[in-house]
Swiss-Prot record:
Xref: InterPro entries: Glycogen_synth (IPR008631)
Name of the gene: GYS1
Protein name: Glycogen [starch] synthase, muscle
Function: Glycogen synthase participates in the glycogen biosynthetic process along with glycogenin and glycogen branching enzyme. Extends the primer composed of a few glucose units formed by glycogenin by adding new glucose units to it. In this context, glycogen synthase transfers the glycosyl residue from UDP-Glc to the non-reducing end of alpha-1,4-glucan.
Binding partners and assembly: Part of the GYS1-GYG1 complex, a heterooctamer composed of a tetramer of GYS1 and 2 dimers of GYG1, where each GYS1 protomer binds to one GYG1 subunit (via GYG1 C-terminus); the GYS1 tetramer may dissociate from GYG1 dimers to continue glycogen polymerization on its own.
Chain intervals with Acidic residues compositional bias: 658-681
Post-translational modification: Phosphorylation at Ser-8 by AMPK inactivates the enzyme activity. Primed phosphorylation at Ser-657 (site 5) by CSNK2A1 and CSNK2A2 is required for inhibitory phosphorylation at Ser-641 (site 3a), Ser-645 (site 3b), Ser-649 (site 3c) and Ser-653 (site 4) by GSK3A an GSK3B. Phosphorylated at Ser-641 by PASK, leading to inactivation; phosphorylation by PASK is inhibited by glycogen. Phosphorylated at Ser-641 by DYRK2, leading to inactivation. Dephosphorylation at Ser-641 and Ser-645 by PP1 activates the enzyme.
PANTHER family reported in the protein's UniProt record: GLYCOGEN [STARCH] SYNTHASE, MUSCLE, GLYCOGEN SYNTHASE
């Protein structure tokens, strides 16, 4: 099946204000997800970062509904009394009938109100509700699948809550219920089955069957049309889960996915074309470092260098000033996340650097949590040796400084032969002896429980990257999430990313991809693929992604070997960049953070909610998408300072000046003039055209005023703003032809 990329009709900056005429005074939004105040995966990040923008739009009429977990409530939620009489009556009614429902405020930016349903306390009704689910939806749930049983309990409790809230409300409300993922989907199906007056939205962040198929080494994207979905789900013993997901997708008034690539996947696996694509954003303010992100990179890199000094003690025969730090991070899905491709490319990169006599060294980190039982003793010893050497050096330095001070105080130059005594030399020799090491530095920082069958370690043994002195590429596998309290690498994830030079995410299955997005907003170049939602989004909106530090690896139309070769080419060309070029590229990368801000991507969610309201309450709301001229489409321009040929960006002299290497002064251009990133950004923005907003929404009820939200007012700036929700309904049809 051909998977052609199509541009959005109106994309990006310079947009006029969105004249949103929806009156939300009598509308209430409930966002339902298993990961509300309950960190499990990426949906938690979506909800957490989007909460402020959604709260600005809906105000006190915005609520999140999730499961009650003791850990989550203790650390993330402040329990409160219900703020309205209708809500208080709803909670009291449910609690009096054997449920346990809690209300509070989620302690994140925006402070959204949350309703937490205790799933375990309602287990007494599980069998009855499973019977009702079978009678209503013909979906049977086996007793042994605890996660699916929890989904049934959560779905029935959610529907009970929404129905009770509508019954207890004295005025007629227009309720929107937005359900995320299959774990919350049963509630949506029951809302429709019980004919509750609720506008429903279902968002799938990744299809169940797609994730299972890709993990099984299937040629997924070339066979989407050919899968017997019922058979495939049954063979993997997830048929009941698949039915939950598919039923929710078909029952929803509006069905959305997080990326164009997932929209195509949903069309064939869930048998419904998504109405809108709702890309995931980030709270860019959280990562904002003003103009100091270059300095933050240097500070964070210094923390990583300290770890490297300890880890490679005894084999530290490479120059840390000429060392680049690459990393891959995420869930430990060896093939889906592209760790197999990355390792193969590192082996080829190692060969290229060695045969070309490069002085550059690459340290590649794999941050993927796996089953371990403790830290590696050699790794701990390395950090202890490093700290001991540092203490020894400081002791000698203090003694040397004191003698130098005394000598200068009396007006004479010191005798250098007497500055250090025999004890000092003995101390230093002991320190040098402590750095002697017979074995190679360890590849893994922890003791793995299944060392012999671990896919990363098995591949490393095959390709022979053992951190030997001859290798220009070193590998460090850190099978645990990063923490600032770790005795090995005491940095949190954000600080670690800032200190690296390149994030590598060659995923085969990645519906969106928050890791490269986080790199972008922190000004760190990254490699993504055209099979990830993020990669497709950036490829669609940027004329020359690589010039901005966004490298898009082709895994759609290339074989695995060709993809490895292309990734090797990306890595090798990055290693050939000068420090000056990397500084300029980081500036450009950081500028793209505007593309990923919820202030702009939040419009897609707003459009989905307005579409749902118009479908559920057509007598009060209308939603009329207008076709836009394809010529209005816009892609972020190529940077004005990028030369037409890479050869023109090389130095005429093999040596760089100190001015060029100082990020505080800014790098020099080829003619010797100072490079000004703000001036370059202004040039880009002058090229931006302002396409007309392609659709209008309105409210036909007899209310006087309309509620302008902060998301709309933010568009008066000239930052990069997506103009319309990407509707895959037409483009998916084109891709089938």
């Amino acid at each position: 099946m051909p998977l052609n990329r199509t541009l959005s009709m109106s994309s990006l900056p310079g947009l006029e204000d969105w004249e949103d005429e929806f009156d939300l005074e009598n509308a209430v939004l409930f966002e339902v997800a298993w990961e509300v105040a309950n960190k499990v995966g990426g949906i938690y990040t979506v909800l957490q970062t989007k909460a402020k923008v959604t709260g600005d739009e809906w105000g006190a009429n915005y609520f999140l509904v999730g499961p009650y977990t003791e850990q989550g409530v203790r650390t993330q939620v402040e329990l409160l009394e219900a703020p309205t009489p209708a809500l208080k009556r709803t909670l009291d009614s449910m609690n009096s009938k054997g449920c346990k429902v809690y209300f509070g405020r989620w302690l994140i930016e925006g402070g959204p109100l949350v309703v937490l349903l205790d799933v375990g306390a309602s287990a007494w009704a599980l069998e009855r509700w499973k019977g009702e689910l079978w009678d209503t939806c013909n979906i049977g749930v086996p007793w042994y699948d605890r996660e699916a049983n929890d989904a049934v309990l959560f779905g029935f409790l959610t529907t009970w809550f929404l129905g009770e809230f509508l019954a207890q409300s004295e005025e007629k409300l227009h309720v929107v219920a937005h359900f995320h993922e299959w774990l919350a989907g049963i509630g949506l199906c029951l809302c429709r089955a019980r004919r509750l007056p609720v506008a429903t939205i279902f968002t799938t962040h990744a299809t169940l069957l797609g994730r299972y198929l890709c993990a099984g080494a299937v040629d997924f994207y070339n066979n989407l049309e050919n899968f017997n979905v019922d058979k495939e789900a049954g063979e993997r013993q997830i048929y009941h889960r698949y039915c939950m997901e598919r039923a929710a997708a078909h029952c929803a008034h509006v069905f959305t996915t997080v990326s164009q690539i997932t929209a195509i996947e949903a069309q064939y696996l869930l048998k419904r074309k998504p109405d809108i694509v709702t890309p995931n954003g980030l709270n860019v303010k959280k990562f904002s470092a003003m103009h100091e992100f270059q300095n933050l990179h240097a500070q964070s890199k210094a923390r990583i260098q300290e770890f490297v000094r300890g880890h490679f003690y005894g084999h530290l025969d490479f120059n840390l000033d000429k060392t680049l730090y690459f990393f891959i991070a995420g869930r430990y899905e060896f093939s889906n996340k592209g760790a197999d491709v990355f390792l193969e490319a590192l082996a080829r990169l190692n060969y290229l650097l060695r045969v070309n006599g490069s002085e550059q060294t690459v340290v590649a980190f794999f941050i993927m949590p796996a089953r371990t039982n403790n830290f590696n003793v050699e790794t701990l010893k390395g950090q202890a040796v490093r700290k001991q050497l540092w203490d020894t050096a400081n002791t000698v330095k203090e003694k040397f400084g004191r003698k130098l001070y005394e000598s200068l105080l009396v007006g004479s130059l010191p005798d250098m032969n007497k500055m250090l005594d025999k004890e000092d030399f003995t101390m230093m020799k002991r320190a040098i002896f402590a750095t002697q090491r017979q074995s190679f530095p360890p590849v893994c920082t922890h003791n793995m429980l299944d060392d012999s069958s671990d896919p990363i370690l098995t591949t490393i043994r095959r390709i022979g990257l053992f951190n030997s002195s001859a290798d220009r590429v070193k590998v460090i596998f850190h099978p645990e999430f990063l923490s600032s309290t770790s005795p090995l690498l005491p940095v949190d994830y954000e600080e670690f990313v800032r200190g690296c030079h390149l994030g590598v995410f060659p995923s085969y299955y990645e519906p969106w991809g928050y890791t490269p997005a986080e790199c972008t907003v922190m000004g760190i170049p990254s490699i993504s693929t055209n099979l990830s939602g993020f990669g497709c989004f950036m490829e669609e909106h940027i004329a020359d992604p690589s010039a901005y530090g966004i490298y898009i690896l082709d895994r759609r139309f290339r074989s695995l070997d060709d993809s490895c070769s292309q990734l090797t080419s990306f890595l090798y060309s990055f290693c050939q960049q000068s420090r000056r070029q990397r500084i300029i590229q980081r500036n450009r990368t950081e500028r793209l953070s505007d593309l990923l801000d919820w202030k702009y991507l939040g419009r897609y969610y707003m459009s989905a909610r307005h579409m749902a309201l118009s479908k559920a309450f057509p007598e009060h709301f209308t939603y009329e998408p207008n076709e836009a001229d394809a010529a209005q489409g816009y892609r972020y321009p190529r940077p004005a300072s990028v030369p037409p040929s890479p050869s023109l960006s090389r130095h005429s002299s093999p040596h760089q000046s100190e001015d060029e290497e100082d990020p505080r002064n800014g790098p020099l251009e080829e003619d010797g003039e100072r490079y000004d990133e703000d001036e370059e950004a202004a040039k880009d923005r002058r090229n931006i055209r302002a396409p007309e907003w392609p659709r209008r929404a309105s409210c036909t009820s007899s209310t006087s005023g309309s509620k302008r939200n902060s998301v709309d007012t933010a568009t008066s700036s000239s930052l990069s703003t997506p103009s319309e929700p990407l509707s895959p309904t037409s483009s998916l049809g084109e891709e089938r032809n």
